[in-house]
């Protein structure tokens, strides 16, 4: 089993795989706990004592490092470059910092995308009569790839990216386009309801409901951050457990804030600006109070203020 963008906290699952004689290789960029899984190999630049110089790769970027190393060992490296478009899209869609290696990944990934776009991607960019740039990924391709996983199944997007027959790829893309329209409607609905639940006197926004679509919680959290500029968590109820997504503001580590309240949580994971978590119903209010107190103390009792950078 090779994991991409997950697995660094899956101690029990990997122990189960070990018992069945299955080797597991973890490719993940999320922050590990003190106890890491006993996997065959862990590739994560954010684990302790890792001397890899760049910590900002996305999960897909780390997977690309693995296949590049395998290809290099077998005597070549050119074969893997055809996948740089996928790595670039993942890097942009996961909002990784556009510095260091990520700049090179995106630069050369966009070259692959412009020179020979996969049939499924071509459906979405066919009306753009110029070179595809980073913003086209952020606002066009990325949200559509995400839509199927949020609303139906991520396998639909896998089929989109691997289908070489243009007609078949276009049919998959049309299905994804319809799913994306549904995603946008649900996102709007949840965001509007979530805004009504916010408290202007608090340093954080933690909002929840029993019937919100799980697939759009991360987007809704981002929308609330844009509007109110506060660390934000949006949750929905599923089998008596609140599950959801967290998003942060610039220069505030929301993972550390969530980690500080782990005694209230069932599960959690993520990184500085985005995280996921689940909480039993009876622990929700305790966590909300703790989270608010932690953030308030961390910022010195002053509300967050958005800064705008510009060239001079």
Where in this protein do the model-derived segments appear?
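Hydrophobic helix-and-loop "lid/oligomerization" segment in the mid-to-C-terminal part
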Residues: 1, 20-21, 38, 71-292, ...
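Conserved phosphate-handling catalytic cores of large alpha/beta enzymes
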Residues: 3-96, 258
């Amino acid at each position: 089993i090779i994991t991409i963008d997950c697995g660094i906290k899956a101690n029990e699952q990997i122990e189960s795989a070990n018992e069945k004689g299955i080797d597991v290789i973890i490719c993940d960029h999320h922050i590990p706990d003190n106890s890491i899984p006993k996997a065959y190999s862990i590739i994560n630049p954010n684990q302790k004592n890792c001397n890899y110089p760049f910590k900002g790769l996305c999960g897909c970027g780390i997977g690309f490092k693995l296949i590049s190393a395998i290809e290099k060992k077998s005597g070549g490296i050119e074969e893997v470059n055809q996948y740089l478009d996928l790595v670039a899209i993942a890097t942009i869609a996961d909002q990784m910092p556009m510095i260091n290696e990520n700049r090179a990944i995106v630069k050369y990934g966009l070259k692959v995308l412009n020179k020979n776009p996969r049939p499924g991607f071509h459906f979405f960019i066919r009306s753009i009569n110029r070179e595809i740039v980073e913003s086209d990924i952020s606002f066009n391709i990325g949200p559509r790839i995400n839509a199927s996983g949020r609303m139906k199944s991520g396998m639909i997007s896998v089929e989109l990216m691997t289908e070489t027959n243009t007609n078949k790829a276009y049919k998959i893309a049309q299905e994804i386009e319809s799913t994306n329209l549904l995603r946008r409607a649900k996102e709007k609905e949840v965001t509007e309801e979530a805004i009504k639940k916010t408290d202007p006197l608090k340093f954080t926004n933690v909002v929840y409901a029993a019937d919100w679509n799980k697939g759009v919680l991360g987007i809704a959290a981002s929308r609330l951050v844009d509007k109110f500029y506060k660390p934000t968590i949006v949750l929905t109820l599923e089998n008596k457990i609140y599950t959801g997504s967290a998003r942060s503001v610039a220069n505030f580590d929301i993972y550390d804030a969530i980690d500080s309240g782990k005694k209230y949580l069932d599960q959690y994971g993520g990184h500085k600006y985005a995280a996921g978590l689940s909480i039993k119903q009876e622990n929700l209010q305790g966590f909300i109070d703790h989270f608010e107190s932690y953030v308030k103390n961390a910022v010195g009792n002053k509300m967050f203020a958005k800064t705008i950078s510009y060239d001079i």
